[in-house]
Amino acid sequence: AIEARVKAIADDPRVRKALETAEEQVPFAIEEQIALSEIPAPTFHEEERAAELIKRLRAYGLTEITKDAMGNVLARRPGSGTGPAIALAAHMDTVFPAGTDCTVRREGERYIGPGIGDNASGLRNLLQILRSLQAANIETEGDLWFIGSVQEEGEGDICGAKALVKNGI
């Protein structure tokens, strides 16, 4: 039964369109990842990266975007209301201290820079998923929440994510 459901989803032309869009947009997504990575975001100082994330979420069609008291970014993509909500989250901060040169450089097929993998890659994935869903006009049964959390690294002690859980998201 589950296999048949997965096959039906995979065979849906909208899902194929979303996957094709994601593949086609890899070069753009990499540039987006670099741009996000080059915004300094040491733990407790994620504001500038959060502002850029909000700007991009709006550009990709989301209108219900808020920041909670901790500074977490929460963006809702409404579903039809017939299914459970799903949260997709990535933390915005990096382990690198204030003053670190965040320039990303390319060496062959590799991109090297503070926070390019941890966690500009997670933010890139959130945005790439959103763009792909929008391009394919996929309506989900439940709401999708795109979340940029704060204070994950080091002394941040995942406080942003803890606040999300405590507050019911």
Question: Residue ranges of each PLM-predicted region?
Answer:
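Acidic/histidine-rich catalytic neighborhood of metal-dependent amide-processing enzymes
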Residues: 110, 115-169
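Acidic/His- and Gly-rich active-site-bordering loop/insert found
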Residues: 4-110
